[in-house]
Regions:
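Gly/Pro-enriched, hydrophobic low-complexity segments
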Residues: 132-217
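Short, solvent-exposed coil/turn segments at beta-strand boundaries
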Residues: 15-16, 41-53, 66-78, 125-128, ...
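Residue-level marker for the onset of beta-strands and adjacent loop->beta junctions
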Residues: 38-40, 65, 118, 130, ...
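Short, solvent-exposed aromatic-acidic interface loops
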Residues: 56-63, 81-87, 159-162, 196-201
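N-terminal mature ectodomain segment of secretory-pathway/periplasmic proteins
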Residues: 3-84
């Protein structure tokens, strides 16, 4: 973990209070579904952990879905609207709270200085791996970060609730950092190209491929 922090340029710097970032990529809602273009803006707060992610998905020619994923005061919420007007989904509750906290923990890769906050506990998880555990708002999330021989982070895996017919089930949720996917923003070297996959009993379901196009700290 220390080598990763050193290579990121975070050692010796104050913890970033906030991060604003832009994403572009592709997503799909089913293993056999079509890929849909996505653009998103996200803001992450590190003092009292919070984030807001606002995305626009081109579902079909002339049809756009607006999505908003939030985490604040220990509560997660996901809203989806068609044409920015008609509600498609509005989800909250314990499973969403756990999933949002797990997402927050995983996305500390974009705010390396915040990885040393008191609310994150690190422990060894074997060669090239470290387990991070975070408790906030009465909920605990944990996951394993993996690193290459140089100390660069290569991925993250955790268990998160996967929504399916009949109810949500805990499944393995995997983030893979694409080879050569690191960039430097504002003097901070971070991974900028990812894929996100559910590891399900009937096979892997990669549902999101993303690239950071911009990131700004404390603005």
């Amino acid at each position: 973990v220390r080598t990763w922090l050193e290579r990121s340029g975070a050692v010796g710097k104050e913890i970033a209070r906030s991060v604003s970032l832009k994403q572009k990529g592709m997503m799909r809602t089913a293993p056999d579904g079509k890929w849909m273009p996505v653009t998103a803006d996200q803001r992450i707060i590190t003092g009292s952990p919070a984030f807001i992610w606002i995305a626009e998905v081109a579902a079909a020619p002339g049809i756009f879905l607006s999505a908003r994923d939030t985490y604040r005061e220990g509560k997660g919420r996901m809203y989806i609207r068609a044409l920015s007007l008609f509600p498609v989904a509005d989800a909250g509750g314990p499973e969403i709270n756990q999933g949002a906290l797990t997402r927050y923990l995983a996305e500390l890769v974009w705010v390396p200085s915040a990885a040393v906050n008191d609310y994150v506990r690190w422990e060894d998880a074997g060669p090239g791996a470290a387990k991070a555990t975070m408790t906030w708002g009465g909920i605990t999330a944990s996951g394993v970060f993996t690193f290459d021989a140089n100390g660069d982070m290569t991925g993250f895996r955790a268990h998160r609730y996967y929504d399916r017919k009949g109810g949500a089930t805990l499944e393995e949720w995997i983030i893979r950092i694409e080879p050569g996917g690191y960039r430097e923003f504002g003097g901070v070297r971070i991974p900028a190209r990812f894929s996100v996959t559910w590891h399900l009993k009937n096979g892997d379901f990669t549902w999101y491929k993303m690239e950071l196009s911009d990131i700004r700290y404390n603005e």
